[in-house]
Design a protein with these regions (language model features):
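C-terminal flanking tails of non-heme Fe-dependent oxygenases
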Residues: 5-199
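Basic, alpha-helical interaction scaffolds
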Residues: 1-2
Length: 199
């Protein structure tokens, strides 16, 4: 966890500079000594079984309720929508609009999550993705991945930080109820579970 947090904070340090935030604006919210909902998970997606659809998502399209997600995996299965994705409706891409994220030996896949999108008032974008059965012969193997997710300290107000690069809230945004990171994380997980139950 400590090493993963160090990597995430290096990324957030770069983002602080690019967003013209004072040093520590993001990194101070992600200390290993603070109570938070950071997590380290081992994920297993079973191998392809004949008779089941190869393209049936192992995890439906979603964005992560984290600041930074760091994924270690050695089989395919992760997909992201193309930038010019053809949409069925405002939230649903066509099957042809998804592309594979190829895992590379000795590399991790890094994804920004919803927390950074909130803290930057949509300047940073949370990456939408899904998990499907691995392509080709890889589908014959169980897919194991290690996922590290960092979240702001539990008492962090989930509101945009102040910076010349971050737009001020609109009057409508300013009316929204302010929650801390702990409550926001719990609400986000409940939403994902609700979507999963409907699938």
């Amino acid at each position: 966890m400590r090493d993963g947090n160090t990597v995430a904070n290096i990324i957030m340090g770069v983002l602080e500079r690019e967003l013209q935030l004072p040093t520590g604006s993001l990194t101070s919210l992600h200390r290993t000594t603070a109570r938070s909902s950071d997590f380290l998970r081992v994920l297993r997606y079973p191998k392809f079984v004949p008779g089941k659809s190869l393209n049936r998502p192992g995890f439906p399209p979603h964005r992560d309720a984290v600041s930074v997600a760091i994924l270690f995996t050695w089989l395919g299965g992760l997909q992201i929508p193309m930038p010019n994705a053809e949409m069925i409706d405002k939230d649903t891409e066509t099957e042809e609009s998804w592309r594979w994220v190829k895992p590379l030996p000795g590399h991790a896949i890094v994804n920004l999550g919803d927390a950074l999108q909130i803290l930057s008032n949509n300047v940073l974008k949370s990456g939408k993705h899904r998990v499907v059965k691995a392509p080709g012969p890889q589908a014959g193997f169980d897919r194991y991945s290690v996922l590290l997710g960092t979240r702001p300290a539990n008492d962090t107000p989930m509101t945009a930080l102040k910076s010349p690069r971050i737009p001020a809230y609109t009057p409508e945004q300013a009316k929204a109820k302010l929650v801390d990171a702990q409550q926001w994380g719990a609400n986000s997980v409940r939403k994902v579970l609700s979507v999963m139950e409907k699938k």
